[in-house]
Amino acid sequence: MVNLKKIAKEEQGSALITVLIIALIVALFIGVVLGGIYVQSTFIQQDIDRTKALYQAEQQIYEFLYSGQEPDSTGTITSTNYGGFLKISSSTQVKKQKITLEVLTGVLPDSVFDYAIALKDTNSSLSVAGSTTINGDIASGSNQIERSTFKGFPFRGSFTGEAKKKNMRDFFPAFQYESLEVQLDKHSSFYESESKSKFAVRDLSELAQSQEGDTLYFADSQEWSINETTAIPKDIVVLVEGNLTITGDGNLGPYTTFFARDTLSIGGSIMATHAIVSAGIFMELRDQVSMNAQLISRGRIQLMDQVYLTYPSMVYSSTTTYLGEQQEVIHMQDESTVDGTLVYPIETGTFNQEQFRIKIDENALLRGSIYNQGQTELAGTVYGSVLTKQFFFYESPTTYINWIKDAEIDITQRPQDFIVPIGFSDSTKYVILDWKEVTE
């Protein structure tokens, strides 16, 4: 073995030692450069593999939505109903790079939603009174709209559009709401299951310590005050035996589900993103609650004060029983606002007085659409379309069927890329609402 110290001593004063040192430095430099190139090429290759995996995951989603093709052996794709929308998960792997994408999708509305009004009832023509303003075409069983005098006051509003006669039995769309009912059944059956105790927690502090995707069960009614420091994991499912009341200024998190067996009340300035909020008997949102949410219930739903459900929200009720003497299944009161769709899909009574109603008060605003197999009582504003079996309002001592008084419907003000829940059409045109990469 070469003894560098011996060589250095023997060659002291000569140029050999200098050459050896320079050679060593050059060798080290070359090693560092080659090592850097190797590391760099490794990272570049990882980026290339990751990009390929990302592209394949995106391609799987596209093929699933628009061509119905199954993924090849390199990846997997699954879909589940998430309220009225569809949640899709796509996973692929290229070498060591694995990518999972999750998307939330709705659908573009059918052409019937391009009408300001689609009136299913053909027993009487539509009458407009007071200051009612309608901007857009009207589809009904008649090609005439009555501009009516009401208690001596002539019609002073406007109708900009055409009244088009349609066979409303065929033209008025059906809504396939079974998937929503299956989701409600799944949550309802949980309360009867013997395994529910495995998911039991006692209070809000235990909920905050849970993990993403957990299911949590509360055996008693709950009253929570949520603030900005309250951490709620995403994708959790919370089921409460009895009533659930939530107030404060906190955030309920993304993709969370809250289900109360009896009643659910949310107040304060609570927020949420793509949440599902559900109740068995009655649901109320009040104060300055502002959330992107799907409200799903077999009971009555009431929005009050300055509640704002941001796009693309949905409010759905399928109740067939009265709560007291109130026939409103969905009621937008005060200055509440919904950007999305109100849905009541159940056709119940054959007589006018037996119909369940969606009611929008004078200062309330809907940007989107109403789909209602019952009656619509409209005093507020709809920037979008109203698809309803009947219109209704009452002014003592008379009930007025298929009259609209002092309301506004303007299809031109609806959001341009407006979507509706899945279930209105067999030939769906999907729209991606949210897109995220899942970190594993």
Protein language model regions, located:
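Beta-strand/loop motifs with alternating small/hydrophobic and polar/acidic residues, enriched
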Residues: 2-121, 126-128, 142, 427-440
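Intrinsically disordered, low-complexity terminal regions
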Residues: 14, 20, 26-36, 40, ...
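Residue-level marker of beta-strand positions
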Residues: 15, 27-28, 137, 294, ...
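Short, charged, low-hydrophobicity "junction" segments
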Residues: 35, 113-115, 188-193, 314-323
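Short, ordered "entry" segments at domain starts
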Residues: 82-86, 91-232, 237, 247-252, ...
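Structural motif
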Residues: 120, 218-221, 240-242, 261, ...
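Hydrophilic extracytoplasmic domains
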Residues: 273-274, 278-282, 287-440
